[in-house]
């Protein structure tokens, strides 16, 4: 079976992708900063610009997930630079390694994010319960938004784009998956939603009407594998579920699954979020409605298209 080299393979998404690949019979190698010699792992050092040449030479596919967590820390100037550099420098190192190392890599599947897009252009975000709403959302041809996340995503995709160049060692098929808010019981955004619910408190952010374009981690892992296996796919694709939800709907759905009717609801004012999160508060208060139509047209079928099915099967 084919060998897949994964960067960022120990994170939330990387672990799900790795496990699915192994279930399907692929051989998986994780690129890691650790110098410990261990089967299934290879070393790279982004800051030093070094990478295990054997890992590149023996890979059939590369899944590129490396990057500092966007929401892990408050956005200081230094942290924003780290978020950007961890993505662009790792991409540049992969491009350089592919160019300099004889290899058989058929495709590179890279993460990106719906941070590419800005706030919704229309007022449709207030009707996030409508099953047809995603069809009205952002599509892949929309330009990147000129804020921190938009410019970061644009630089991220641009930094990996040279793998398609018509030169020796490159000429790879490239797919960039612009990922929405990932829902998983193992961490990520859902962990933050669950914290106040430990006190039976459904904490709705702002007015709660802002649209969340989300994706179940199981569908996202399936999508990365799908991108490997479907040679007709290339370019950018939105990795979001077909039915986005409002912040209020997501929060109350979670509360109902955990406690039935026996929970309290509280609204967290915008000014409190701005004090707590700083610039990042803009991201949790804005609506970004994104359409997955392109990936669906490519034949991908979501197992968890609606929030109720996703949350009810996550074994929270």
Model segments located where?
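Mid/C-terminal beta-alpha module of Rossmann-like enzyme folds, strongest
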Residues: 230-279, 312
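N-terminal Rossmann NAD(P)H-binding glycine-rich loop of SDR-like oxidoreductase domains
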Residues: 4-24
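Alpha-helical substrate-binding/gating segment
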Residues: 194-202, 210-244
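Catalytic helix-loop patch of NAD(P)-dependent Rossmann-fold dehydrogenases
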Residues: 85, 123-176
